[in-house]
Amino acid sequence: MEEIEIKFAVKDTKIITEKLGKLGFGVTVGRHLEKNYLLDDHDGNLQKAGTVLRIRKTPSGRTLTYKGPISAASKLKHREEIECRIEDADILLPMFEQSGFKIRTEYSKHRTVFEKNGFEISLDETEAGNYLEVEGPSDADITKLGEKLGYSETDFVRRTYAELIGEKRSG
């Protein structure tokens, strides 16, 4: 499945939450902690190829996700995403490690999810700052929604959380 998304930096989470409410977005998943583990082989070939293999733990479950490389053909992030629920991440992580993979990056964030009309918006609080991650049906729809929230194309953040947090940690 193709994922189409973009991030925007958020200065004030209360203001952006109010704007989303005024636009009719409702909270579908309340604020919760997510733990993310990005896996790679020992040579870093997944990162070099621009792909991601991630295990995510949330209070409602665990998922294994593959993300393909980000397309350069758009200002927004287009990439293949394949995801499945897993029962026991604590068993799966050592299985990957025994198969030649290692945890390349580990990070946590608090996330609140809002939805409406084919959009999924995540308000993410990370150690690198707060971001609004907008997934939607098309570039035009996402850009239009961004404008309603007070953002423009110059505010697009195409970097991944792993990149943003890595920069903050090395910084």
Stretches found by the model and what they are:
Residues 1-119, 151-171:
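N-terminal strand-loop-strand beta-hairpin
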Residues 12-16, 130, 141:
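Short phosphate-engaging motifs
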Residues 145-149:
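Internal alpha/beta scaffold segment
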Residues 70-73, 129, 140-141:
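Short, surface-exposed beta-strand-loop junctions and turns on beta-sheet-rich folds
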Residues 123-125:
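A contiguous pocket-lining binding segment that forms or flanks enzyme active sites
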